[in-house]
Amino acid sequence: MSNLSIQLLKALEPWRNARAWHVAFSGGLDSTVLLHLLAQLRQIHSLPPLSAIHVHHGLQAAADAWPAHCQALCDDLGVPLQVVRVHVQAGASLERAARDARYQAFVALTQAQEVLLTGQHRDDQAETFLFRLLRGAGVSGLAAMPHQRGLGEGDLCRPLLDVPRAHLEAYAQEHNLSWIEDPSNVRTDFSRNYLRHEIFPLLTRRWPQAAASMARSASHCAEAQGLLDELARQDLQEAGSVSEFDWLGLQSLELAPITSLSPARQRNALRHWLAALGLLPDTDHWAGWDALRDARADAQPVWKLAEGQLHRAGGRIWWMAGDWLRQPIAPMQWDNPLLPLALPGNGQLQLLGQAPGGSLQVRYRQGGEVMTVKNRGHRDLKRLLNEQGLPLFARGRLPLLYVNEQLLAVANLPGLDCSPCGRWQLQWLPTKSDQGLS
């Protein structure tokens, strides 16, 4: 076996027992060499079933001939090929939109215990590092492309990431491989192409090992980010106490353990926490965290992000997104209380036990409501909610059950959610706040 084959087999060792290997096959040099290497290796090694995926973006006329080229090579190698046509959304960055469309297709086609293999190499890693450096990225961004990560229900692996492009070219020439040269790759109005064709030749003439050095720096940053993530998990463990209002279904953290940290550790912990919800705020936007953290104790500060918000209430910070940012629709008649009632944009409501008689209606708080409480008589709802400590942001979404225009119960709040004699209980299952940042 060639050194390149040995290096590839070693990189793929953790996935030798996967259900399938899919090669992201553009038809270019990188993916052509990767597919050819794998097709040769499977002749002498027991490997998972191998297939190829070609994504047709439909962005240029030349691309219409590429599926046929890919099919011919796959036929020669005996590898099944799937061609997927995607629609690229118009936007400011055509490169990013095409990448997003491509990876959406890959996510849909990669099942559990399956691996998508891509052909990025060391020169690509160096370009990514420099591109992000010029955009002012932090340690996480400068870590560039990881060797592996999750992809939908499966995994993505870049087994050639430590291999220089020159080695791939030499392999292709040795085996008389032909590949597609994308005409758009010479357009220097694309940022990556500008770096590849204008900047890197200058750098490598002065520093021949520039690409290798940048890739090594990216590896150092990845290791540093791993330590930062480990520290963040430790700090978040201190703040991850259970709230009495966990039934709201919202992600939340106890504020005091976070604010006891240094400002840098606060941001590190919150970056790690918010990363699971989507894109992180940029450097200038972190002033919103300072304002939320330092607001008066009796204030209700909000940090507004792209598609979500952080609220501070009850000594905690709460992540809200999606339906939680929209006013639910009310009132609603509940004609059959034996069945759960779907609340538009607000989950569902159900009555446990023997339903009360009369005309049932569900409303939301408007202000000035009064209800009768066992052994306490008539009480203002506002005072009752204050006694319960329910966060203000949740009060306008809390379902109120009326019978013949009388406020009878408040969902989920002990002592207010059931009949005086215990014949029934009002239970609310809120909508999930699962929409992340954009």
Go through each PLM region and give its residues.
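Core alpha/beta nucleotide-donor-binding catalytic domains of modification enzymes
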Residues: 1-201, 206, 230
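AMP-forming adenylation/ATP pyrophosphatase catalytic core
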Residues: 4-29, 51, 57, 86-88, ...
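A broad structural signal for alpha-helix termini and local helix breaks/kinks
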Residues: 110, 207, 274-278
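Residue-level detector of well-ordered alpha-helical segments, enriched
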Residues: 125, 213, 265-269
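Amphipathic alpha-helical interaction segments
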Residues: 194, 198, 216, 268-269
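Short amphipathic alpha-helical segments with coiled-coil-like heptad repeat character
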Residues: 206-209, 393-395
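Substrate-binding/catalytic subdomain of NAD(P)-dependent oxidoreductase enzymes
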Residues: 211-219
